[in-house]
Structures are given as C-alpha cells and as structure tokens.
Amino acid sequence: MLTTKPCHCKEVLKLVLSPLTQHCLVIGETTCAFYYLLEAAAASLDLSDNYMAFLYLRKASSLLGQPSAFSFYKKHKVKICQFEEATFCCLRSEVCFNMGQITLAKKLARQALRLLKRNFPWTWFGVIFQTFLEKCWRSCSLSQPPDNPSENKKKLAVLQQQVQCLSLLWQLYNLEATASSRRFARLATLMQENSAKESASEAQVVSTYVALSQFSQNMGDKEKWLHCEQMAIQKNSLCWFSREGLLATAQLMQALAYTKLCLGHLDSSIRLGFQAREICRHLKKPALENLVLSVLFRSAFLKKKFDLCVHVLESQWALISEGHDVLGLACFYSACLDLLLYGKGWLCRPFGECLHFIQHYEHSCILNSQSNVMLGVHSSLAMWFAQDSQWKLFEHHYSKAHQLVKRTNASLFGSHGFVRFLECHVLMLQKMPEGVFAHTASETPRQTLKYFKEFFSRCVTCPVYHQWVSELKASVMRYGKRESMSLTNVIRPFDTCLTRIWIEGEFLEENNSFEGNLQRFVRVADVKENKDEEEIQECIC
C-alpha cells in the first residue's frame, strides 16, 4: 500500500542543512544562511522538534538585526524578499503556538498574512465585512483562468503559506471559548478553505477539509463536521500517488478514527487508527502519530481493552519521552490517570509520576492555554484523591476544574474532561451533607442538573459519552428525591455503565450513516431533556 519512499528529513537536516548554514555563516553569505536557517527551522517543526526550530529562528533573527527571535524592526541587515519574511513570521508563529505564547503567535500570523497580501481583520465589524468578501468576491476569483506557469508556481507557494497561517489562526482562536474568538476562528477557516481551493492542490484541499471537519466538531456543528469529512473523502481518491497525498490520507484516516470514536463506533475507530499509524510511521510524522495514538487509547479504553491501552501508551511514551513536548506529555499522563482510575489493576505509569508532572508544569504557558486537556487532568486527580478520602486535595483539584469547564469546547478532550468534571460534581453533591468540604459552596441537585443540560447542548458532536452522562444525571434525579446515593457507583462508574456504551451495535449500528446516528442521538437527548425537566419540577415540589 505504501509505495512512496520513506522520509529522510532528519538525515537531510543533520547532514545537509545544518552544515550548509554554518558554511554560509563562515564565508559571510548571510542571505543564503538566512534561507537555510528557515529551511532548517521548517524541517525541525516537521519533525516535532520545537526547541531546535526556536534555536534556528533565533539565529535567523540575529541575522536580520533583531536582538531576539520575537521583536520587530523594519530595517533588516540582510536583504530578503517579502515571501521569505512572511515565511519567517509564519514559522515563528508556529513556534510561539507550541510554546503557549498565544497572543504573540496571533500577532505573527497576522503579520505573515499581511506580507502575503491577505489581511486578517482585528474587529468584529471587520470580521463581518471580510466574511462577506470571502463568500462573494473570493468565490468569483476562484473561477478566473490560470496565469502563466512561472506565475502559477509563485502563486502556489504564496497560497500554501496563506493556508498554513490561516490554519494556525483558527487553532489559536479555537483555544478560547468566547463568542468573539469563535467568529474569528470561523472566518479563518473560511479563508483557509478559499485559499486551498485556489491553490488547486488536491492534497492541500483534502488537508484543509480535514482541518475544517475537526474545527466543526469542536464547535458542535454536526452538519458541517460530517459534510467536510465527506468532501475530504471524495477528494482523497486523487491523492494516493504522492508524498503530500499520502500525508493527506493519513490525516483523513486519523480524522475518520476520531469521528468513529466520537460516534461510538469503537471497533472501526481502532481499525482506522492502526492503519493511520502505519502511514505515519512510514512518513516519519511523530506529531500526527501521537495524535493517532491518543485516539487509539480512548477507543480501546471505552472498549475496555486495557491491555491494548497499555500497549498504546508505551508506544506513545517512546514518541514523546525524548523531546520537549509538554502538551503531549500532559495528554499521556491524563490517559495514565484514566487507566489508574478505571483500568482494573492495569498500570502504565505510577500515580506519583503523574502527579509530579502536573505539579511541575501546570502553571506553564503551554498547559495554561489547553483548557480541554487540563479539565480532564484536574478532574481525574480529584477523583483519585476522593478514593483515598483526601477531601482537601479533592477540593483543590475540583476547584481548578470548575474554573476550566466554561473554557472548553465539544472536542474529544473537552467532552472527556466535562464527563470527568460531572463525576466529581455528583460525588461532591453526595458528600456535601457530611461537611467534608471547607471552601466549596453548597450545591443543590437543581444546580447540578444545569451542568448536565450544558453538557448535552455543548457536546452534541461527541455522543459516545451521552449514555453514561444520562445515567449519571438520572442518579442525581434520584438523589434529589431520596437524598441518598451510593458512593461506590460514583467512584467506579466504568464497572457498571460506561463500558457497556455502544459495544457492537448496542446503541449504534456500524453500517448506519453518520448523519442518521447523530439525528438519532439528538432525538434521544431531546426526549431525555423533556423528561428530566418534568422530573426536576417534581423534585422542586
């Protein structure tokens, strides 16, 4: 199946680009040295080595006459073209994004787009106006006849760089769960889609549709989510015979595994995940492979295949342990905590190691910007301390999770974190009469049920958790009537409920369409909400 040659970027970087850079610096060819530094930084990012990319860009910045990698001076010592300057800004934006410097990353991405003749607005009025232009003027420009071949080559490079900058922008704005950020993110995805179509590169179009599918799922837009995925599948048939096409195929298979997981098709998700991982290993794409492994773990975990979970985590550890990927390690330790809590004795990393990592890095810029991941981490830590009746530590991590829940979205990590938070909240409600909490305000079942309503309205594109959350909600309803609940059922939910969710067509049919399944879940959720509202009124009375 894999007919293209494997990637040799690491060898090229070590044996070609780095020596060429040093050679040009020694002989005083600063312009050439700057070019090779950009190439080396891009290769490092492609290999998921953000630290080396930062060092290359800092050296390139010094050639331009800037005292640091992230300051701005209009006059440069080295003469570079506008496209190279835009590439420089785009690479710095990506490095800042990976380092958690979100505001600076946005500024650099905007600067790169301005240099590429593609301005991105700053205000809500500008967003409205630019959206109108993208839907009208840009669609007209896509039908214009192509230029001569030499101009096309330059234009293609500019368009590809625009796509990269716009992809960074929507990911940056997607980290913030505000209405304003969502507007900016939606505009960035629209502009990215238009630039990708204008480039006429099938691989670029497929990658863009995969990205748009991911964004729509995060925003809870089920129709756009499945539409973009379907478009990516249709376009992907032309992409198999190139390296870029194979990478786009790997991205698509990862997205399909993600979708199958969100919808509850766990066996299909696992199968697609292993296929995507095979391509990632062939292409030597560690970042994408790590993402695939995260999806694989979650599918195996919900399927209750804990031996496979350990195997996946060991593979993930081999990928990220030698680098400086703090976010990757946070996702890894979050998965380890899940296995410790609900894995029935299976272990990958001890609790002390997980706790030490979180305590060491939780205040870093990188993790501060990742609310979805940290919500799950703090909620899992709270549940662990609850098992040992360490209520002060439970309260400490629960309060941190409580601050994060409003800042999350419908992504897989966001939905998973929300589920963990609901488990903590129900447990806290049950323990409240015992007076074990010193700094937490009293909660009523009615207040707790508001969180369940928010979950179902926000996480509509992640129905794999809906069954368990519905049962957890029912326990709150019963508690509101009887003022009694079993602590064991809250602490060990996977033993009774979650492991039964959508196993081999129990609630989902593997052959059903995505749209049909989602519509079915929406109808079920609506019925449950109506019934629950009636029961709430009974509790109040």
Regions found by a protein language model. Name each.
Residues 25, 32, 44-45, 90, ...:
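Hydrophobic/aromatic side-chain positions at a characteristic register within alpha-helices
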Residues 4, 21-24, 40-42, 61, ...:
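Conserved small-residue packing positions in alpha-helical repeats and bundles
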Residues 48-54, 80-84, 122-127, 158-161, ...:
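Alpha-solenoid helical repeat architecture
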Residues 1-99, 104-111, 160-201, 208:
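Extended alpha-helical scaffolding segments used for macromolecular assembly and cargo binding
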Residues 41-42, 61-69, 110-121, 193-197, ...:
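Amphipathic alpha-helical segments of tetratricopeptide repeats
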Residues 190, 197, 209-325, 329:
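Hydrophobic, small-residue-rich alpha-helical packing segments that form membrane-like cores
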Residues 30, 47-50, 102, 182, ...:
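TPR-repeat structural position
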